[in-house]
Every structure is written in structure tokens, then in C-alpha cells.
Amino acid sequence: MDWTWRILFLVAAATGAHSQVQLVQSGAEVKKPGASVKVSCKASGYTFTSYAMHWVRQAPGQRLEWMGWINAGNGNTKYSQKFQGRVTITRDTSASTAYMELSSLRSEDTAVYYCAR
């Protein structure tokens, strides 16, 4: 295990030790090229509107890749240049849920997608 993974583990362990924050994502999906996918992330254990929600992905054999984030309070968004025009991040404050929609899917979009507070 290299130092970067140790740091990530320690941060995750410290966060989990002091809270009951939970982020529950929708399940796996299979899509055809050119289609769109919308992933949900339901938050609990904290005030949803007080934090930003980030979306990252990890393709097979690749590093984590940041896609964008949303300010859950005011709805402002910022996207990675790489995904600009294809990704849309939204939120429903009444349901404490964030959404990430990726359009014009291609084979290179095969990945595990994560939300992160």
C-alpha cells in the first residue's frame, strides 16, 4: 500500500469514527453507447444543505477522477473541464439527495461512480 492509500484510509476512518454520516447510492446500471445515466446519492446523518457533494469515478485500472460538485445549499455547480457539457449535477433538498447525470455515454465511461461529501 503506498502513502496515498494510507492517507485516504486514515481520513475515511477518522470521518466514520465521529459521525453516522451515510451516503447511499443507486445500483449498478448497464447502458448502451450514446445513452444517458442518472445516479442518485441519498444523504443522512448531517444537514444536507450545509455541505457540497462531489462526484468522482474510477475506471478499471485507473486513478480516481473528479467530475464535479454541487453546493447543496444554493445549487451552484462546478464541473471538470473533461466532462463539461456531458455531466449535470443536481440536488433535491427535500429528499437530501444529489444526482449526477452523464450523457452521450461511450465505452470509456465504464467505471465505478462515487458521491463524496
Curated annotation (Swiss-Prot):
Any GO BP annotation: immunoglobulin mediated immune response
Phylogenetic lineage: Eukaryota, Metazoa, Chordata, Craniata, Vertebrata
Function field: V region of the variable domain of immunoglobulin heavy chains that participates in the antigen recognition. Immunoglobulins, also known as antibodies, are membrane-bound or secreted glycoproteins produced by B lymphocytes. In the recognition phase of humoral immunity, the membrane-bound immunoglobulins serve as receptors which, upon binding of a specific antigen, trigger the clonal expansion and differentiation of B lymphocytes into immunoglobulins-secreting plasma cells.
Segments of this protein annotated with the region Complementarity-determining-1: 45-52
Name recorded for this polypeptide: Immunoglobulin heavy variable 1-3
Gene behind this protein: IGHV1-3
Annotated spans, Framework-3: 78-115
PROSITE patterns associated with the record: IG_LIKE (PS50835)
Organism listed in the record: Homo sapiens (Human)
Cysteine-cysteine disulfides: 41-115
